[in-house]
Design a protein with these regions (language model features):
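Cytosolic, long alpha-helical scaffolding segments
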Residues: 1-139
Length: 139
């Protein structure tokens, strides 16, 4: 990561462990964002196949959460970070939780489409509101 403030420790391995936590977090965030985009697209376009892919994709996001949690707990146990490093690790742990929740909500959107067998489609106004909500979430 260019211009990163992570580093400057005597142990290069420690710097790399902290950097890896952030990199994994960003990868997870990108996956969850794609999952949400796909869920919105599937819902608006009534695309059951894409909705099923969103549901199936949730496992990847959940696996990232477990992996990052274990990585951060390992850092806490072995390195006993202080000050800035501790705040970084705790921020990653909190963010992972929030990102995983976004993935869960995207899955719920997909499941709602898959369960709706009535063929009822949202009105144009409802679709516009849904697009607005989706755009706000992406910010």
């Amino acid at each position: 990561m260019p211009n990163s403030k992570i580093g400057g420790h005597y142990s290069q391995a420690y710097d790399e462990e902290l950097q890896q936590a952030v990199v994994r977090l960003l990868q997870m965030a990108a996956l969850a964002q794609q999952q949400l985009d796909d869920a919105m697209t599937a819902f608006i376009g009534a695309d059951a196949e894409l909705a099923q892919q969103v549901k199936d994709f949730d496992r990847k996001v959940n696996n990232f959460e477990v992996d990052i949690d274990e990585h951060c707990l390992d850092i806490l146990a072995r390195r006993q970070p202080a000050a800035t490093d501790l705040r970084l690790v705790l921020s990653v742990l909190k963010s992972v939780n929030d990102i995983e929740r976004i993935g869960d909500l995207a899955k719920r959107i997909a499941k709602a489409l898959l369960k709706d067998e009535s063929g009822n489609r949202p009105t144009e106004v409802q679709l516009a509101q849904l697009n607005t909500m989706g755009a706000k979430v992406q910010q």
